[in-house]
A protein has these predicted regions:
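Internal, well-folded beta-alpha domain core
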Residues: 91-245, 250-257
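Active-site helix-to-loop segments that bind/position phosphate- or nucleotide-bearing substrates
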Residues: 4-93
Length: 257
């Protein structure tokens, strides 16, 4: 089984964690070209383009200007992203064998690097899927990557057993020909819901935390099939069979928030 996670907006440039190997992103050339184009924008342009504040615009202006420098720091993707999902995944305590297993059974989407393996070494950036760049052809990042990623993604899933556990945000489907993905492999999408005001609701913070915890559960326990996902339990979240079907696995928390 292969797990898909979304990249995070927040990134780190340092880590003391040792990994068994470091790999080059399969779309390094494309990422380099994207970063070069992004480096042509001014601070004000980045602020508007990425919908970020002035401080973050300055930070990412510096990142893109330094992207191709030899001394720019870089980290394995699994350690570089620091959003809520990755904090809960907590790969800092992974063993050598767990990192190696993750390398074969986890993929991370990236608007800059396309599709990453956990130990692919990357540099810090900020990018959104709706950003349009002139080369090639004034395409959004979604359109740019779709034709490049779909074959590789499907091949990765098949190598990992032909089953995808989709724990990425919904917008990431647009990076691929998702209908084709669903035709060629089995896709299971876990959902996480909590009780609020007497109704089940999807709350972003709980979704992100649960995605990270489930990914950790899968990698630590080497879950190879959807049936194994049903035993996931965390902070009151349990598999809810009555709300689930073969494509959608719903996990609910019985506590009112």
């Amino acid at each position: 089984m292969l797990v898909l996670l979304s990249c995070a907006k927040t990134m780190s440039e340092t880590s003391k964690v040792k990994v068994p190997l470091k790999t080059v992103p399969r779309f390094q050339k494309e990422a380099s070209g994207i970063a070069l184009q992004m480096s042509q924008f001014s601070v004000d342009e980045l602020e508007r383009l990425l919908r970020i504040n002035a401080r973050m615009a300055v930070e990412n202006y510096k990142r893109y200007k330094a992207f191709h420098a030899e001394d720019t720091s870089e980290l394995p993707a699994l350690l570089a992203y620091t959003g809520i999902v990755f904090k809960r995944l907590n790969a800092k305590d992974f063993s050598k064998e767990e990192f190696e297993y993750a390398q074969e059974h986890l993929r991370l989407t990236s608007f800059c690097y396309g599709l990453l393996r956990p130990l692919d070494v990357i540099r810090s950036y900020r990018l959104e899927g709706d950003v349009v760049l002139p080369e090639p052809g004034n395409q959004t990042m979604f359109s740019y990557w779709k034709s490049r990623l779909t074959d590789v993604f499907i091949e990765d899933i098949k190598k990992a057993g032909g089953i995808l556990c989709n724990l990425a945000s919904d917008e990431m489907k647009s990076l691929f020909d998702w209908k084709r993905v669903e035709r060629e492999v089995r896709v299971v999408t876990p959902e996480f819901q909590v009780w609020k005001n007497g109704k089940l609701a999807s709350i972003v913070i709980y979704i992100k935390m649960s995605r990270g915890e489930m990914t950790r559960f899968i990698l630590k326990n080497r879950i190879e099939n959807p049936e194994g996902l049903k035993s996931f339990s965390w902070e009151g979240f349990e598999f809810n069979e009555s709300l689930s079907d073969e494509k959608k696995f719903v996990f609910t928390n019985g506590k009112e928030i």
